[in-house]
UniProtKB/Swiss-Prot annotation:
One of its GO terms (cellular component) is cytosolic small ribosomal subunit. Belongs to the eukaryotic ribosomal protein eS1 family. PANTHER family: 40S RIBOSOMAL PROTEIN S3A. It is found in: Cytoplasm. This is Small ribosomal subunit protein eS1. It comes from Ostreococcus lucimarinus (strain CCE9901).
Amino acid sequence: MAVGKNKRMSKGKKGGKKKAVDPFTKKDWYDIKAPSMFSVRNIGKTLVSRTQGTKIASDGLKGRIFEISLADLNNDEDQSFRKMKLKCEDVQGKNVLTNFAGMDFTTDKIRSLVRKWFSLIECFVDVKTTDGYTLRVFCIGFTKRRMDQAKRTCYAQSAQIRKIRAKMVEIITRECTTCDLKELVLKFIPEVIGKEIEKSCAGIYPLQNVYIRKVKILKAPKFDLTKLMEVHGDYSGEAVGEAVARPVEEKAEETAEAAE
C-alpha cells in the first residue's frame, strides 16, 4: 500500500499568532460634571476612544446619556428611588458637561406604593418650559383613608377620579410653564408639585403618595453654550478628590527612618 502525502496535515497556518492588544490603551478617561442644581458635581468617569484621523473623541461623547441615582447626586439616601438622566452636551478639556435629560422612579418604589383597597390615579401632560423644552410629565397618586372612616376600602368614584385628574393636569401645567428647566428640576427634587396636588384635591377626595414619577424630554431647543455654562456655573476650581490629613505620628516615624 502506497503511503501518500496528506496535504491537509502538512499545511501550516498562514501568519503567526496574533499578539493580544489591550483595547484600553487606545481609550481615555473623562470626568462627568453634573449641573449646579445638584450638590455633588463630580459624578464619575467615562471612557472614549482617542481622536484618530477624522474620528474625534468629543463627537463620541456628545449625546451620551448617564443614569445616576439622586441619592448620589445630593448625598441623601432618602432620595434613592429617583433616577436622574444626564445628557452630555459639550466637552471641555477632560470634562464632560451634562444637562438634565429625564427622570424616572425605580421599579421597586412604584411596586411598594401600589396597594389593594385604594384607588390609583394616573395622568400625563405635555408642557413647554420658558426656555423652550417640551416635556412629558407623568403623575401618580393614591386615595387615602379619612380620619373617621370605618369602611375598609378607599375607592374613589369615577366622577371624583376625573376631577382629580383634571386638577393634576391643571397644577402640572401651571407649575411647569412658568419656569425654566433648571427651576423645574429644583421643584421635582423636594416634590413641590405632588404636595400642591394633595392640598388642592383634599376637598374632592383625600390623597397620599402623590409623585411626579417620570419626566421625558420630547423636544429640546438648539444647543447654546452660554446657557449650558450658566447651568454649570464655575466648575473649574473643584477638586476631584478630597485631601486626607496624615497623622502626626506617621510623619514622625518616617522622619526617624530617613535619619537612620
